[in-house]
């Protein structure tokens, strides 16, 4: 049974281990105490304390989901991680990046060959992490992932707080992926030879206006819609993180994903994905 080290054993990893624990020997590494893996370690990977060399003692795959620190332009946590392991023991590393590295493309179709133009410091740290992975000497796959939703990961607080939504006719597009679909893609990527040393966009393949996404949630909950506002009002109302999302838009081209993994997406219909997430 192949060993898989889950670095940043958080939300998405719960779906990975729930479905694939009979197929892989999972080692979970994160700050909190968890029991979803065969081997679980409560370790802060941002500390270069030598313990990672003891934990990653057997050849295996790495799925790296640990976020960068909250400031600066370089992912210092990844720097420490790569220095703290025996690279020869890593068969392949799957790095979970973000579609935010593309910046604002004003609803244009974006494939993996496009030049990245990260606008926020958060996205610049992710771009730096991609560079580190590509130059690590380890076989890799970089997945550029958009908004992740799923059970326990719907914006229900914003819905219950009735946060105003941007008018549908002017709202820009967003890209989403269900956590179950993402976990499946991650695992299939581990051993697929066509994914060696590539960058791949992943999403459900059905771009949607952000407001429509929220309205589908309101519909599923049988709730009355909130107030609709324009972008000028939104930039006065929303917090800084929310504003960075609404002011960037693109349509992810997932042709490569569909070529390598045809029919891998179960929740192409966002309404079905929301229904499952609320179940």
Q: What are the functions of these language-model segments?
A:
Residues 192-241:
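Mid/C-terminal beta-alpha module of Rossmann-like enzyme folds, strongest
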Residues 13-14:
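N-terminal Rossmann-fold NAD(P) dinucleotide-binding loop
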Residues 224, 244-279:
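C-terminal amphipathic/interface module of NAD(P)-dependent oxidoreductases
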Residues 134-174:
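NAD(P)-dependent short-chain dehydrogenase/reductase
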Residues 57-95, 128:
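NAD(P)-cofactor binding segment of oxidoreductase domains
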Residues 106-142:
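Catalytic helix-loop patch of NAD(P)-dependent Rossmann-fold dehydrogenases
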